[in-house]
Amino acid sequence: MAAPVRRTVAWVYGHAQRFGGDPQRIYVFGQSSGGHLAGVLLTTDWRKAFDLPADIIKGGLCCSGMFDLKPVRLSVRSSYVTFTDEMEHLLSPQRHLDHLHAPIIVAYGTLESPEFQRQSCDFAAAVQAAGKPVQLLVGEGYNHFEIVETLGHPYGVLGRAVLAQMQLAQA
């Protein structure tokens, strides 16, 4: 899944102006597995992979994702998700923070599973420790399925944060 998503972002960057887009304003968002993929995109080495500027993504929101895949390999999921050591390393955003060139919002709800909460807190702490801009948002009273709904409202927990990150928030 990561490879086609990366190719898509590279394509959007190269073609955005053809359909009225601005390649200098690419932001990514994902929740759950999409939160993991947003993290992968934000920590991609765009120069090495696509010969593009390192900072093609200007910001992102990673909501309720997995950012270190080692625990996935140790869980019951290992019966149907098989990773090699190399895949685990390559697909763990937390291990590639040297390629993070944009502010990031990491979010989760207080009613989510402890592992989603831990992964989000650990990822945000690692980003901060790397000296990169990060905002950790905790959605009080939201579960894994409800928190994403706040993105669709400009005053919701996620909606407000994303609009501010994109400098589109109304004063």
Regions found by a protein language model. Give the residues of each.
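Alpha/beta-hydrolase superfamily serine-hydrolase fold, recognizing
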Residues: M1-A171
